Amino acid sequence: GSSNAASTMVALNRLWDINLDTENLIDIAKDEGADVPLFIFGKNSIGRGIGEKLKSTDSIEDNLLLIQPDIHNSTQEMFIELDKSREENGFTINSNQNDFWDIYIKRDSIVRNFYKQNSSDYNLNLSGTGSCIYIRYNEKKELDKILKKIPSNWRFFFCKPLQYSPICYI
């Protein structure tokens, strides 16, 4: 949904010759959804705040294994849980881990077990608020163990990340 909203905003801005710059589009986009600004920014970045404070990061050259568990994950519910967690435990910043990881693995026992079985051998990462998990790798043979442990009702894909969003070229 968020990438669709951003794509629509960028396309209409260009098609209708509104000519808003990226900064103004991002300012409008933050009212449309937490990660819409990220998609308007259009390049590898780290988001802060509700996703509207963006800082470019180095390009990701690694290959990715994208794992899609067979569960639905509500973005709204994840933000509610994150707010509750911060109220109870205080606010901490760990730039090396997605803030939603701990919440995500508590929500589903199969995901939690998968994480426990594989996190010591692989650097598991969460995409956004979930539900996709990704692992960076160089050679597919590095993934032999984990591919055997992915539940049969989960999907997985071998990917290469784009360095810029295709909407940057509209």
Regions found by a protein language model. Give the residues of each.
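ATP-dependent small-molecule kinase catalytic core of the GHMP/sugar-kinase superfamily
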Residues: 18-123, 136-170
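Conserved glycine-rich beta-strand-loop-beta hairpin in the small C-terminal domain of fold type I
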Residues: 131-133
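DPxDG-like acidic metal-binding loop motif
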Residues: 2-22
